[in-house]
Amino acid sequence: MLHQLTLAEIARALADKQFSAEELTRTLLGRIRQLDPQLNSFISITDDLAIAQAKAADERRANGENGALLGAPIAHKDLFCTQGVRTSCGSKMLDNFVSPYDATVVEKLTAAGAVTLGKLNMDEFAMGSSNQSSHYGAVKNPWSLDRVPGGSSGGSAAAVAARLLPAATGTDTGGSIRQPAALTNLTGIKPTYGRVSRWGMIAYASSLDQGGPLARTAEDCALMLGVMAGFDPKDSTSVEQPVDDYLAALQKPLSGLRIGLPREYFGAGLDSRIADAVLAVVEELKTLGATVKDISLPNMQHAIPAYYVIAPAEASSNLSRFDGVRYGYRCDAPQNLEDLYKRSRAEGFGSEVKNRIMVGTYALSAGYYDAYYLQAQKIRRLIKNDFVSAFAEVDVILGPTTPNPAWKIGEKNDDPVSQYLEDIYTITANLAGLPGLSMPAGFVDGLPVGVQLLAPYFQEGRLLNVAHQYQQVSDWHTRTPAGF
């Protein structure tokens, strides 16, 4: 069945002419139309664009090209600008916004021959951990349709997990690639801050946001990241650092690998069954030659309060551009300019976005800046220092991706703090700018759980290597949700 193939398998099959990119694209578009109404993972389905790109890929292949992503079907989280296609950011504010240009990530993947099947649902302006804040409705987890898929890249995760497509782009500001990957049995990687261009990626928190891939295997993530990564002069936060050969890195044996287990990751709040699954992964990695050491990240306890000052502060600044004047939602019959601003923003933004804008504006206001924003930035530096100390002793840090499996849709709506706590293990990588990866590690009551790996700056290859070697001796990543 074509929909069961991974990206790597698709690349080999297309090279062997087992089927055409157009045939594959039409098959998956049909599957999306048939099954996505159960999931709500797509905001826009780009049939005509996809078929045109697939035909072009087949032509390029007929002319001797043979790139790994040539003709590979993917979709983009709906905050990556796509020329001529709506880019909504999951918000009423941008419901009618059609981007005049491609984001660098989209441009690179398209140039490599990837076929865009559509734009994927997400928490509004990437603010959320459950994909319930989208203007287009909640996304459902294919492993249990009454549960969340995680967020904010929930549409990306649900679509790949349900085998609607082999891989998708996502973004990660506090765990928004890794957490949904864990809750839907996928592999997802957040690269080092500056590794992947943010140009054309609608900003939530500019010092934290980073784009990356979600797929079923580490090998597929390596294929995607190898194209997505690299310096971009259009992005002032992009880093001039050579891109490693991620595919070659997969094959390195793990003998001598030093793994650190932070004691803070295994304390109160962690489901004991997830802890058991994580420790089972550790034992398997030890049989592959890794050694394990207990470490400490003492400032992790301050990560969530620091994050929920810094991220909303940056969001309140970034989202000030959405005022009803140049593009996006505009209220009807404004009385004057002030009325235009107030009503356009009040009507265009959802409640979670407005909450975070208010928190961020408060944290930056005179009299509170030193008490909140400056203190949060000091904590951020302490968290970074903790990682620098830890990586002097170990090569990789390992722990759970989330403290709990997927919760029921609506279950945590009245208690936002409990929802924020689901990101407790992922936020620190964003605050420090480190690369992080989540990979499948088993199931609890039929729901997937993930293991998170963290590495020093620009060591994405090491993360992919560990995940790939583990996936050679495990089969969690091959499990498919019933009905899909």
From Swiss-Prot:
Name under which the protein is recorded: Glutamyl-tRNA(Gln) amidotransferase subunit A
Active-site positions on this chain: K77, S152, S176
Organism: Pseudomonas aeruginosa (strain ATCC 15692 / DSM 22644 / CIP 104116 / JCM 14847 / LMG 12228 / 1C / PRS 101 / PAO1)
A GO cellular component entry from the record: glutamyl-tRNA(Gln) amidotransferase complex
Subunit text: Heterotrimer of A, B and C subunits.
GO MF, any single term: glutaminyl-tRNA synthase (glutamine-hydrolyzing) activity
Keyword Methyltransferase: no
Record keyword DNA repair present: no
EC number: 6.3.5.7
GO biological process, alphabetically ordered: translation
